[in-house]
Curated annotation (Swiss-Prot):
Pfam families: Pterin_4a
Family the entry assigns: Belongs to the pterin-4-alpha-carbinolamine dehydratase family.
Keywords: Lyase
Covalent S-S links between cysteines: none
Record protein name field: Putative pterin-4-alpha-carbinolamine dehydratase
EC top class named in words: lyase
Superkingdom in the source lineage: Bacteria
One of the protein's GO biological processes: tetrahydrobiopterin biosynthetic process
Gene Ontology molecular function terms on file: 4-alpha-hydroxytetrahydrobiopterin dehydratase activity
EC assignment: 4.2.1.96
Reaction catalysis annotation: (4aS,6R)-4a-hydroxy-L-erythro-5,6,7,8-tetrahydrobiopterin = (6R)-L-erythro-6,7-dihydrobiopterin + H2O
Length: 118
């Protein structure tokens, strides 16, 4: 476990600062399986999780939904047969906040015990 998966999200307002380049370089090392994607001019963190079937993929999606609700920070989720794509970014600041890295780490923790992972 790392410090990120033990942390909790803080309220993120529209005027909250995005992570700096230095923070980005440090934080991304703590979530090595995630990719930075640029969409609509802003950075997002994305990872694809593979499962044996749709039932397991849906259960994982619901588990991520539970932690998202608990933290008040919500990802993009695409659930397909045997696959879930999870995308974290801070909508209010149109970019990456420390909260997104926390939620990536928390997602990784859920994935470790998710049934039906490939």
């Amino acid at each position: 476990m790392n410090a990120l998966n033990q942390a909790h999200c803080e309220a993120c307002r529209a005027d909250a600062p995005k992570v700096s380049d230095d923070e980005l370089a440090e934080l991304i090392l703590q979530i090595p399986d995630w990719n930075i994607e640029v969409r609509d001019g802003h950075m997002e963190l994305e990872r694809v999780f593979l499962f044996k079937n749709f039932k397991h993929a849906l259960a994982f999606t619901n588990a991520i939904g539970e932690i998202a609700e608990a933290e008040g920070h919500h990802p993009g989720l695409l659930t397909e047969w045997g696959k879930v794509t999870v995308t974290w970014w801070s909508h209010s600041i149109k970019g990456l906040h420390r909260n997104d890295f926390i939620m990536c780490a928390r997602t990784d923790e859920v994935a470790k015990t998710a049934e039906g992972r490939k």
